[in-house]
């Protein structure tokens, strides 16, 4: 059994301003995405400029933050949102949803594609290899905050988290770091290294993320305000990941069936 190594969620202070590790992880994620995008943009076959990359990162960040927060309130805390809609803007209380962020990024990349006269599927194929490292950074932020812990376990690496009772739990944030971050990055970055049929890269991302998240949810403690949403075992995260698996699998088949580059 391990004990959570208490880490101050505040990384440093600038006068009265507190800079939290979680916020820094978002910045690290965006910085890594920007760097990887610039690296990929050097390939003339991809038809991207540095200016377009910078604009894309801005649109992506906007969609992620707005969609992530709104998605959390709608998917995970709807009753509180209806009772007090202003809680949407209380971002300091925490609460972000990947699935909401995904919807937000879909919208903003569509707007970006219209403004730059690029095909939306080409934009998403360029974006998704950048996403997993950002997800990895976010899960490290969750671990530093001691939040989103796992279910009670007897495995030797079970960890006692503050505010989670005396029993050891799965460090599910680290599982998600490995699955949705490191492993997903390796798979999608390798797959996208060659030019693939249009939307194949995006489809594989949807399929793999859905599978990895669905698996990780078996070790993660369900949100207390929701519990299990169906069958006595299905979580909200799994419920939202199922459409990704289905759509991703079908879209991958469709992309190779048409083989449009």
From Swiss-Prot:
InterPro entries: Lgt. Pathway: Protein modification; lipoprotein biosynthesis (diacylglyceryl transfer). Its EC number is 2.5.1.145. One of its GO terms (cellular component) is plasma membrane. The keyword Transmembrane applies. Keywords: Cell inner membrane, Cell membrane, Membrane, Transferase, Transmembrane, Transmembrane helix. It comes from the Bacteria. Its main location: membrane. The chain crosses the membrane at residues 19-39, 56-76, 92-112, 126-146, 173-193, 199-219, 227-247. Pfam families: LGT. GO terms for molecular function: phosphatidylglycerol-prolipoprotein diacylglyceryl transferase activity. It is a multi-pass membrane protein. A 1,2-diacyl-sn-glycero-3-phospho-(1'-sn-glycerol) binds at residue 139. GO terms for biological process: lipoprotein biosynthetic process. It is found in: Cell inner membrane. PANTHER family: PHOSPHATIDYLGLYCEROL--PROLIPOPROTEIN DIACYLGLYCERYL TRANSFERASE, PROLIPOPROTEIN DIACYLGLYCERYL TRANSFERASE. Belongs to the Lgt family. Catalyzes the transfer of the diacylglyceryl group from phosphatidylglycerol to the sulfhydryl group of the N-terminal cysteine of a prolipoprotein, the first step in the formation of mature lipoproteins. NCBIfam families: lgt. HAMAP family: Lgt. This is Phosphatidylglycerol--prolipoprotein diacylglyceryl transferase. It comes from Coxiella burnetii (strain Dugway 5J108-111).
């Amino acid at each position: 059994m391990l004990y959570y190594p208490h880490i101050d969620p505040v990384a440093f202070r600038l006068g009265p301003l507190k800079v939290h590790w979680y916020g820094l992880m978002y910045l690290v994620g965006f910085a890594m995405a920007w760097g990887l995008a610039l690296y990929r943009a050097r390939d003339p076959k991809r038809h991207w400029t540095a200016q377009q990359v910078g604009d894309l990162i801005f649109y992506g960040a906007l969609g992620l933050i707005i969609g992530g927060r709104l998605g959390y309130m709608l998917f995970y805390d709807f009753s509180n949102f209806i009772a007090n809609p202003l809680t949407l803007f209380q971002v300091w209380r925490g609460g972000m949803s990947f699935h909401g962020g995904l919807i937000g990024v879909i919208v903003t990349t569509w707007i970006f594609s219209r403004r730059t006269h690029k095909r939306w599927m080409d934009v998403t194929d360029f974006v998704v290899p950048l996403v997993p490292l950002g997800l990895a950074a976010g899960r490290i932020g969750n671990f530093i905050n001691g939040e989103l812990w796992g279910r009670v376990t007897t495995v030797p690496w079970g960890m006692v988290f503050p505010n989670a009772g005396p029993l050891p739990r799965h460090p599910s944030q680290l599982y998600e770091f490995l699955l949705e971050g490191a492993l997903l990055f390796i798979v999608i970055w390798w797959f996208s290294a060659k030019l693939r049929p249009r939307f194949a890269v995006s489809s594989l991302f949807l399929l793999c993320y859905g599978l990895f998240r669905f698996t990780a949810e078996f070790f993660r403690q369900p949100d207390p305000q929701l519990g299990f949403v169906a069958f006595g075992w299905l979580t909200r995260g799994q419920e939202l990941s199922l459409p990704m698996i289905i759509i991703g699998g079908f879209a991958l088949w469709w992309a190779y069936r048409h083989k449009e580059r």
